[in-house]
Amino acid sequence: SERGLTPNGYDLRIAEISVRGDPEIKREGTVTIPPRTMFYVSTIERVRMASDICAQLWLRTTWIRKGVIGAFGKIDAGFEGTLTLGAYNATDDPVEIPIGERFCQMVMETLNSETIKDYSQRSGNYQGQTGVTLDPLKK
C-alpha cells in the first residue's frame, strides 16, 4: 500500500508474533511482550528481490523508543518470501505490539551487477517462507 512508502524505502507490517517460551503464534490483536524477552515477527508483505537488488532492514524508531532491539540482516538478492525478524524487549516493563502495525523499514540497494549465485542458488534455506519460520525449509 502507499501508506508503507517512505522517503527511503518501504515500511513492513507485522503478520504474526511468536514470543520465546510461548508455543502459540499470535495472528490478531495486541501481543504483550514480557520484559527481557526475545520474540519473532513475520511480515505481512511478501518480498521478491531481483538478482541485482538487495535490501537493508531498519527497526522503526517507534519501537526503539519503547526499548525494543531488532536483530536484522540484509535481504539477499534473489530472496522471495515473507520475512522473520528477531527482536528483544530490553526493558523491565512489558511492551504491547499490535498485529498489523509497521515494524521495520526496508531500504533497497542496487548491486553493481547481478550476483553470480543469488539466494535461491546459494543456500535458499528460507526461500518461499511464510509466517514465523525459525528452522530452515531445506536441509
Predicted regions and their residues:
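DUTPase catalytic domain/fold
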Residues: 1-139
